[in-house]
């Protein structure tokens, strides 16, 4: 709002200025997997290339015995155990990663789901068959001993088997699972989806929210809230209203978590608007990235360590771990030590919640509870008003994250800026065409291998030149909502770009990846770990695009559809034919 005088009121102050004397609680109670001297010494000794490996190891004996043995060992070395002795201790008291999981072949997997017949290009159809086959490789089931002896594991027990992302990610992850479920439903695997949904509903019942992932060290942070959307897709596919009726109050309970723990109020021109942010007021380094978080903290004054660690967890809660998006507005935006996730009101989080409010209102109406339907309908209307007042920029044709401290929008490009379009949280039908103009103005349509995560090359994995499958979906399906043939054609061309990149890399490497480098159409890089194969949400988005555009998509062997001038030609053609 140009010329507005902004007045900021924060309802939650934790995390916006913690002093060194204000120690935050650890991410979980375990003195092995979440905090304590054993965790510290093992991780700082860097026994493994990836810190996640140690905190994923099951215990061989009871945790009290392990801690007592470690205390005795440490006492013999003046409390600093040599690396060789640490290695021996871990070998004696811990089991190899993955012992508590077993591979699982989904019982509802079938040879030839119907959507494959919609794919005209024979090479793409054969590739889609391979992607469909990957569900068998990504299925996991938790062994019963995790239920009977939970204290010996960092894994959180889930009753039903599930599909994992792949690579180092052998447990469930919250927001990944939405795009996985979309792919599973296309593969006609509704029973697998129902089981995964039930696991998530059980977690909400137990903890009040869905953790970031299926480990105890993830317990105090969530991820983008897509549970209600998952339920919507399952019910739309199956018509299973009984399952919805049984669990609708649990869906409402999850939204209560975000309302009670992640809410802020921002005033503009005398009007107060309630929105949400990512915010994890828990201390200590992330156990799965312990040494990196500790090293990063030592580049800062000791009094700011707790704030740093809380902001890193908030960045992980966003799903974008990490990105220039969470560094903007800081004194040193090139350093991860300046991360300030909780100081920003994210476009995507509020769009996801807006969509969930709309869906929940519709669910209650279908089940005959009009008072609850009205409640969530009103919450959605209030959120759309807040999105429009605080995050929408009419001149640029997009929404932007709002900086609470600096009281201004972050006008950098991120695909998340268009999430309200994907989520249907807008009132002006012309917004999709404005979004297209925004993409053109930002020169995003010049990238022929995918939509970049940002235009800033920081070395963080959620920045240029990486592109991620869910962000392609946000933009493509958002544009596809437009009644304009021109905008719909650009959505198709963006889908063609992404499918070609995925297909080409698969043709070279026989693998799907969590992210791609659009500067060279290869697997992505950067961030805290090596690029991972699998890969759940990448497979899901590819199947969604193949289903939506299967009659038009090309493997590229006959037509060169992907050069930047092709997009320009498509736009020109659409103008001439309107």
UniProtKB/Swiss-Prot annotation:
GO terms for biological process: trehalose catabolic process. Its EC number is 3.2.1.28. The active site is at residues 321, 514. Residues 556-578 form a propeptide. It is an enzyme of class 3 (hydrolase). The keyword Zinc does not apply. It comes from the Eukaryota. InterPro entries: 6-hairpin_glycosidase_sf (IPR008928), 6hp_glycosidase-like_sf (IPR012341), Glyco_hydro_37 (IPR001661), Glyco_hydro_37_CS (IPR018232). Its main location: membrane. Expressed in small intestine, kidney, and to a lesser extent in liver. GO terms for cellular component: membrane; plasma membrane; side of membrane. Keywords: Cell membrane, Disulfide bond, Glycoprotein, Glycosidase, GPI-anchor, Hydrolase, Lipoprotein, Membrane, Signal. PANTHER family: TREHALASE (PTHR23403:SF1). Intestinal trehalase is probably involved in the hydrolysis of ingested trehalose. Belongs to the glycosyl hydrolase 37 family. This is Trehalase. It comes from Oryctolagus cuniculus (Rabbit). The lineage of its organism: Eukaryota, Metazoa, Chordata, Craniata, Vertebrata. The gene is TREH.
């Amino acid at each position: 709002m140009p010329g507005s005088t902004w007045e900021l009121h924060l309802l939650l102050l934790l995390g916006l200025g913690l002093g060194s004397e204000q120690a935050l609680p650890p991410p979980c109670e375990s003195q092995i997997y979440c905090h304590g001297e054993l965790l510290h010494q093992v991780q700082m000794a860097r026994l493994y290339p990836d810190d996640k490996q140690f905190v994923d190891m099951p215990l061989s004996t009871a945790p009290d015995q392990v801690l007592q043995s470690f205390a005795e060992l440490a006492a013999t070395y003046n409390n600093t155990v040599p690396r060789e002795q640490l290695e021996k201790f871990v070998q004696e008291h811990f089991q190899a990663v993955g012992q508590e999981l077993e591979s699982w072949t989904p019982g509802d997997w079938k040879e030839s789901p119907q959507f494959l017949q919609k794919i005209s290009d024979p090479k793409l159809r054969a590739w889609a068959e391979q992607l469909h086959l990957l569900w068998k490789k990504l299925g996991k089931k938790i062994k019963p001993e995790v239920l009977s002896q939970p204290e010996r594991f960092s894994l959180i027990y889930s009753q039903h088997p599930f599909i994992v992302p792949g690579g180092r990610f052998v447990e469930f992850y919250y927001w990944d699972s939405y795009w996985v479920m979309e792919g599973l439903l296309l593969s006609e695997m509704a029973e697998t989806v129902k089981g995964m949904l039930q696991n998530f509903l059980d977690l909400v019942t137990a903890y009040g929210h869905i953790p970031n992932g299926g480990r105890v060290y993830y317990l105090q942070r969530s991820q983008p809230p897509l549970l209600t959307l998952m339920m919507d897709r399952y019910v739309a596919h199956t018509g299973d209203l009984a399952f919805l009726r049984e669990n609708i109050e649990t869906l409402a309970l999850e939204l209560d978590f975000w309302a009670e723990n992640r809410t802020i109020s921002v005033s503009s021109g005398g009007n107060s608007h309630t929105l949400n942010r990512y915010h994890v007021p828990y201390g200590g380094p992330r156990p799965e990235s312990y040494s990196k978080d500790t090293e990063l903290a030592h580049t800062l004054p000791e009094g700011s360590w707790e704030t740093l660690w809380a902001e890193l967890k908030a960045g992980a809660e966003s799903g974008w771990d990490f990105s220039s998006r969470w560094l903007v507005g800081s004194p040193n935006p090139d350093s991860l030590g300046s991360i300030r996730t909780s100081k920003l009101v994210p476009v995507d989080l509020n769009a996801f919640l807006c969509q969930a409010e709309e869906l929940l209102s519709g669910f209650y109406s279908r089940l005959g509870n009009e008072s609850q339907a009205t409640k969530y309908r009103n919450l959605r209307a209030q959120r759309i008003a807040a999105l429009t007042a605080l995050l929408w920029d009419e001149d640029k044709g997009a929404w932007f994250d709002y900086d609470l401290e600096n009281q201004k929008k972050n006008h950098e490009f991120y695909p998340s800026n268009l999430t309200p379009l994907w989520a249907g949280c807008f009132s002006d039908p012309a917004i999709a065409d404005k979004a297209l103009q925004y993409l053109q103005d930002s020169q995003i349509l010049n990238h022929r291998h995918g939509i970049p995560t940002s235009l800033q090359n920081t070395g963080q994995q959620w920045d240029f030149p990486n592109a991620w499958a869910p962000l392609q979906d946000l933009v493509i399906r958002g544009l596809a909502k437009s009644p304009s043939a021109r905008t719909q054609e650009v959505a198709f061309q963006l889908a063609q770009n992404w499918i070609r990149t995925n297909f080409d890399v698969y043709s070279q490497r026989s693998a799907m990846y969590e992210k791609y480098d659009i500067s060279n159409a290869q697997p992505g890089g950067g961030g805290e770990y090596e690029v991972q194969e699998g890969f759940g949400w990448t497979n899901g988005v590819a199947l969604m695009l193949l289903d939506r555009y299967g009659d038009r998509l090309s493997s590229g062997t006959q037509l060169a559809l992907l050069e930047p001038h092709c997009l320009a030609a498509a736009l020109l053609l659409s103008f001439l034919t309107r």
